[in-house]
């Protein structure tokens, strides 16, 4: 039996309603439209069979499969809802308030039994940040951060704390996905000169100095983002500072760290300086993609050794999204960028399409792995609100624009469990569509009247880097570094220009056949025929190679000595001398 079509939930000033997914795009009868502007929150369960929403008066739960109302709770101010992984518990959160007489406020975090509708437990949760408890996928374990320590509950028994993880001041934690044994990553910020650190533990082994599976310390961290891979074998940590002391950025400084449950850890070396915009794991758990660097940003896929596998070059992007099956990757530039998307086949590293979703504030893959949702929502943008459904080949299949006096607040797909939709063969041909693709108008630069009839000279603010495969090629020669390759290209271009200039100056002379070029790393071969000149060329190349190594050390942050800096300053003169010798000047 073919899987049903995913639904689309739309919430805005026009009300709350559902739309059938591709290929129909008609309003669904599963959920009768609820008019008005009072709906503050709505959410599907993890498997998409339940739907809950709060309308300012009640929080309701319906069954999507039989269209029946299950429960209704009197929660006037609920603004956050979350289902547990197996639909056993519905968590609700309301803003915390205290009485005017100064007495403690009432509990504002409620956990309801979805089957019976009874309240299992109520807690006081003052902050909206990290308000929801974290469950394991089988719901045998649930965890909350309470007063800088993690409390663990077993089998949804919230009256008894089964275990505690207490360190100095736990700021954040992330429970691992997948089956047992469960693991937890905790972050403790640094204080009084001590570094910040992230530790990995296996539940319930928290006691003892060697209980941690892995530990990673770093000084430059005011906050962190921890990302488990799907198999719970490793965590990626984005460490951020609020202020960049080097003055290179207004938005602080970021570093990317890799921590494995076997104790291994590493700093992921990013070739381009600048902020880290996004990091995302592939569903295979064997590689991850990072988007980083000053604009135009770079995007690179790394393996579990933190070695680059494929570099997508530079472009206007700040986000990455893997498809549910992990075979397609979308690199996009949203927010203050124009909305250009690059859709890549990451098995063959081939570009599929480059659609543009202008002014988009939201992106989501459909659970079928074929369709994409982009939307422009308020309050991020209050004009041109609406949503589009694309095929990954770049075709717009459906488009909806809200009226000019209305707003769109939220659009979301109905989730499905993994394996419901099988992965399909990737196609590069755009699927047919009745909705025309709107080509964005390219703004032309102003040209004064005196220059309008003259040819346009194109000038670039930066050099764009093309995509390249970073896997080492077969052979014994060690690949050159990026800096060495760049200098090699510059040198070869200068050499060709000089040869061309010399041939222009002496047109009478008969052209002599150019000697066959030799690889840069085969310095032992005779170049000029003169042993003395060959010896000088060999020594110059040795010095230039040493300078390249010094520059690479400086790029990693190593402090160089004065004599080493003086060597680097001599690079231009050495290159010139080498050119003169090779050209026979």
Swiss-Prot record:
Widely expressed. Expressed at higher level in pancreas, heart, brain and placenta. The modification N-acetylmethionine is found at residue 1. GO terms for cellular component: blood microparticle; cytoplasm; cytosolic small ribosomal subunit; eukaryotic translation initiation factor 2 complex; extracellular space. Residues 517-528 have a biased composition (Polar residues). Residues 494-507 have a biased composition (Basic and acidic residues). GO terms for biological process: positive regulation of signal transduction; regulation of translation; response to amino acid starvation; ribosome assembly; SREBP signaling pathway; translational initiation. The modification Phosphoserine is found at residues 503, 506, 517, 526. The modification N-acetylalanine is found at residue 2. WD repeats lie at residues 56-100, 101-159, 160-210, 211-264, 265-306, 307-348, 349-391. Keywords: Acetylation, Coiled coil, Initiation factor, Phosphoprotein, Protein biosynthesis, Repeat, Translation regulation, WD repeat. The keyword Repeat applies. SUPFAM superfamilies: WD40 repeat-like. The modification Phosphothreonine is found at residues 5, 518. One of its GO terms (molecular function) is ribosome binding. InterPro entries: TIF2A (IPR011387), TIF_beta_prop-like (IPR013979), WD40/YVTN_repeat-like_dom_sf (IPR015943), WD40_repeat_dom_sf (IPR036322). Residues 531-582 form a coiled coil. It holds the Pfam family eIF2A. Residues 434-534 are annotated as: Disordered. Functions in the early steps of protein synthesis of a small number of specific mRNAs. Acts by directing the binding of methionyl-tRNAi to 40S ribosomal subunits. In contrast to the eIF-2 complex, it binds methionyl-tRNAi to 40S subunits in a codon-dependent manner, whereas the eIF-2 complex binds methionyl-tRNAi to 40S subunits in a GTP-dependent manner. Belongs to the WD repeat EIF2A family. This is Eukaryotic translation initiation factor 2A. It comes from Homo sapiens (Human). The gene is EIF2A.
């Amino acid at each position: 039996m073919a899987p049903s079509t995913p639904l689309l939930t739309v919430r805005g000033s026009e009300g709350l309603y559902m739309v059938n997914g591709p290929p129909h795009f008609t309003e669904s009868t599963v959920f009768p439209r609820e008019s008005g502007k009072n709906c503050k929150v709505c959410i599907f369960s993890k498997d998409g069979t339940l739907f809950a929403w709060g309308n300012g008066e009640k929080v309701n739960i319906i069954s999507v499969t039989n269209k029946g109302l299950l429960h209704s709770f009197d929660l006037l101010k609920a603004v956050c809802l979350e289902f547990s992984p197996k639909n056993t518990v519905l968590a609700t959160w309301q803003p915390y308030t205290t009485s005017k007489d100064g007495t403690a406020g009432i509990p504002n975090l409620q956990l309801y039994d979805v089957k019976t509708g009874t309240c299992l437990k109520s807690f006081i949760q003052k902050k909206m940040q990290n308000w929801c408890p974290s469950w394991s996928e089988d719901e045998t374990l649930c965890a909350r951060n309470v007063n800088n320590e993690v409390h663990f509950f077993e089998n949804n028994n919230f009256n008894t704390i089964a275990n505690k993880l207490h360190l100095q001041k736990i700021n954040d934690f992330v429970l691992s996905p997948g089956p047992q044994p469960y693991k937890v990553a905790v972050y403790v910020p640094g204080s009084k000169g001590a570094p910040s650190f992230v530790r990995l533990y296996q539940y319930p082994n928290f006691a003892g100095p060697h209980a941690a599976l892995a530990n990673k310390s770093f000084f430059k961290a005011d906050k962190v983002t921890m990302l488990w891979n799907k198999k719970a074998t490793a965590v990626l940590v984005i460490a951020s500072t609020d202020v960049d002391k080097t003055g290179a950025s207004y938005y602080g400084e970021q570093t990317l760290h890799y921590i494995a449950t076997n104790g291994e850890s590493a700093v992921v070396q990013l070739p381009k300086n600048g902020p880290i915009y996004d990091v995302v794991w592939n569903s295979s758990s064997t590689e991850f993609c990072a988007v980083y660097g000053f604009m135009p940003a770079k995007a690179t896929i790394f393996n579990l050794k933190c070695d680059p596998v494929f570099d997508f070059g530079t472009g206007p992007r700040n986000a990455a999204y893997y498809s549910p099956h992990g075979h397609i990757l979308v690199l996009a530039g949203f927010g203050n960028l124009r909305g250009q998307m690059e859709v890549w086949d990451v098995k063959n590293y081939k570009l599929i399409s480059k659609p543009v979703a202008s002014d988009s504030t939201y992106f989501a893959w459909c659970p079928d792995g074929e369709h994409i949702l982009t939307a422009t929502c308020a309050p991020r943008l209050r004009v041109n609100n609406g949503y589009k459904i694309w095929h990954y080949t770049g075709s717009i299949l459906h488009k909806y624009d809200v009226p000019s006096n209305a707003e769109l607040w939220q659009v979301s797909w109905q989730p499905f469990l993994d394996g419901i939709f099988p992965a399909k063969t990737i196609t590069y041909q755009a699927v047919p569509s009745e909705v025309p693709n709107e080509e964005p108008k390219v703004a032309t630069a102003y040209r004064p009247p005196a220059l309008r009839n003259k040819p346009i000279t194109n000038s670039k603010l930066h050099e764009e880097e093309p995509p390249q495969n970073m896997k080492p090629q077969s052979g014994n020669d060690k690949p050159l570094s990026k800096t060495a390759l760049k200098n090699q290209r510059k040198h070869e271009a200068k050499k060709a220009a000089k040869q061309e200039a010399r041939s222009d100056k002496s047109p009478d002379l008969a052209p002599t056949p150019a000697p066959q070029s030799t690889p840069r790393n085969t310095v032992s071969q005779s170049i000029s025929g003169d042993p003395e000149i060959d010896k000088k060329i060999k020594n110059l190349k040795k010095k230039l190679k040493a300078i390249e190594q010094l520059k690479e050390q400086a790029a990693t942050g190593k402090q160089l000595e004065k004599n080493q800096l003086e060597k680097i300053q001599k690079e231009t003169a050495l290159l010139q001398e080498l050119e003169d010798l090779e050209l026979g000047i």
